[in-house]
Amino acid sequence: HVNASGMVNYKDFLKDKAELDTYLKTLSDNPPQPSWTSNEQKAYWINAYNAFTVSLILMHYPVKSIKDIAGKIYKINTAWDIQFINIGGKKYDLNNIEHGMLRRKFNDPRIHFAIVCASMSCAKLRREAYLPAKLDAQLDEAGKDFLNDKPKNRISGGKAKRRERGAG
């Protein structure tokens, strides 16, 4: 339910929500292990982040913006702070995965181009999972795609301008 431009058709995704739920359960029941390689762990967390982001939108569908979700939940500042993710018996929110697991543990700036925040300003959702064996190539490609996306990155008067996260 992702087109070639990385746009997600959430309405159609709802029809196959059972498949997504099965995938999320597989992720939840099989957390990364210390014996896994760095690329195996990184791919796992990127895929988990993206799948749970789609799931969050579907839980609140129809929703105009991911930013509208947090306002529905008492004492939650943003959608990224909702602890709805269970991995290996531990609760996470999207911020935990993005900042606590991905950015802190792997220190790879290309992660920014791989994780989706369900808005026009963010990286596009790939039509395939991130795989350990080709993760570096996938991350490089995601970075090139993002940086070459003119609506997301504009240079005006010699200054770079980016859309804000969660914008449009």
Model-derived features: where do they sit?
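Interaction/scaffold regions that mediate signaling and macromolecular assembly across diverse proteins
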Residues: H1-G168
